[in-house]
């Protein structure tokens, strides 16, 4: 194992967050950059997203609602705060996408946990990041203030698992949610 990888692994196993960019809703603590502090404005948006999902709204509906209410996207909000991000500045600062909403709904960090080793690469020459199964991820509870309660997070994951797309006929196929693409792993709909 290479020195840099060994250091990253040791840090990750101690519970130090390995991510460079903190999740939307948090900012780095000025005294200790490894610690996250709740950003009240962005945290309210995160709570609203979880609340809308609990009420049965899907990611696209939530994104459209946020866009209609002129809520800044995470990258536009960070740019306004003067925080550098890897994303380019969006043309429309309120143009929410369903993928952004899904990414927020799937982040366990909002429950106050630090989650390390979410992805891996096969070797240092392989640049492709692969998702690590939940069993191989290192989850450290109560490392920072929670925005969402654990019970709410679990309920949202349950609600999202039970959602499915409507077909043209309005009926669900018996294979809905059971058949996945062999290439990309996405759910197939019929």
Name every feature range the model reports, one short phrase each:
Residues 3-190:
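Conserved catalytic breakage-reunion loop centered on the nucleophilic residue
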């Amino acid at each position: 194992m290479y020195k840099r990888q060994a250091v990253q692994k040791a840090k990750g196993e101690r519970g130090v967050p390995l991510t460079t960019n903190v999740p939307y809703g948090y900012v780095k603590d000025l005294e200790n950059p490894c610690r996250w502090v709740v950003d009240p404005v962005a945290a309210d948006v995160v709570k609203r997203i979880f609340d809308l999902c609990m009420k049965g709204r899907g990611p696209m509906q939530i994104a459209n609602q946020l866009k209609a209410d002129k809520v800044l996207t995470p990258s536009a909000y960070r740019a306004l705060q003067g925080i550098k991000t890897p994303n380019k500045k969006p043309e429309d600062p309120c143009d929410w996408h369903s993928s952004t909403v899904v990414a927020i709904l799937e982040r366990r960090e909002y429950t106050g946990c630090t989650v390390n080793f979410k992805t891996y690469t096969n070797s240092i020459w392989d640049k492709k990041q692969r998702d690590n199964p939940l069993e191989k991820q290192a989850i450290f509870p109560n490392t920072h203030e929670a925005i969402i309660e654990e019970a709410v997070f679990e309920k949202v994951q349950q609600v999202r698992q039970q959602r499915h797309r409507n077909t043209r006929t309005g009926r669900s196929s018996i294979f809905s949610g059971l058949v996945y693409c062999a290439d990309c792993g996405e759910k197939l709909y019929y």
